[in-house]
Amino acid sequence: MADETTMRAGRGPGRACGRVSGVRILVVEDEPKMTALLARALTEEGHTVDTVADGRHAVAAVDGGDYDAVVLDVMLPGIDGFEVCARLRRQRVWTPVLMLTARGAVTDRIAGLDGGADDYLTKPFNLDELFARLRALSRRGPIPRPPTLEAGDLRLDPSEHRVWRADTEIRLSHKEFTLLEALIRRPGIVHTRAQLLERCWDAAYEARSNIVDVYIRYLRDKIDRPFGVTSLETIRGAGYRLRKDGGRHALPR
């Protein structure tokens, strides 16, 4: 894809202004021609550029370096760009990430952005557009850490995929976490089964499926019953609601 990108990298009279100088950028790309193209072009723009060719080295470099932005290819040997970005966010590294990939499907873009990427550029691309996006990321600076979501003493950390009840950490599966996150983002609001199915499952599950009820039960077994509380309420004929106060304690018998 490097040749195609070069062909679209013309710098005409309409080139954008507002260069941000002195920016340190890490380029994570395993294709040598593309790496050389990006490193040369970014250096000519006045940036300091480092390069690595695989996901593991990318995580180590960003975690140990002081970068202003990362240009991250998705298709990498070892661990891919999606996982690289997710690991960085779990490690509380908030350096802006621009995903760079030949995969232009909407689902791929969503996966990258949901995983913590700040922007997404599909190959083949125009270098001037890349520069403009990096300028925007540099002006924005490091993204703030996503807030911990809370309902009473129940806490969910979206960036680290961790959940606690008071001081006790609770282990959830990926789907349990996704369902709880949908509920805790709007505590006190009734969510219909259809809404939860749409947000947390793919189109393979039909509206009449009882998969939502099954996972609500799984969640209750982990976040409620061991602590003697009821936070997940069934609203008959409507759906489910997570209490804003994190759950009422069961009355002693």
Swiss-Prot record:
Keyword vocabulary terms for this entry: Cytoplasm, DNA-binding, Phosphoprotein, Transcription, Transcription regulation, Two-component regulatory system
Domain Response regulatory, residue spans: 24-138
PTM info: Phosphorylated by HK2.
Main localization of the protein described in the UniProt heading: cytoplasm
DNA-binding region extent: 146-244
GO CC annotations, alphabetized: cytosol; plasma membrane; protein-DNA complex
Top-level taxonomic group: Bacteria
Coiled coil location: none
Subcellular location: Cytoplasm
UniProt GO MF annotations: phosphorelay response regulator activity; transcription cis-regulatory region binding
Record PTM 4-aspartylphosphate, positions in chain: 73
SMART domains the record matches: REC (SM00448), Trans_reg_C (SM00862)
Purpose: Member of the three-protein two-component system HK1/HK2/TcrA.
Quaternary structure (record): Interacts with HK2.
Name this polypeptide is given: Transcriptional regulatory protein TcrA
Species in which this protein is naturally found: Mycobacterium tuberculosis (strain ATCC 25618 / H37Rv)
Gene field: tcrA
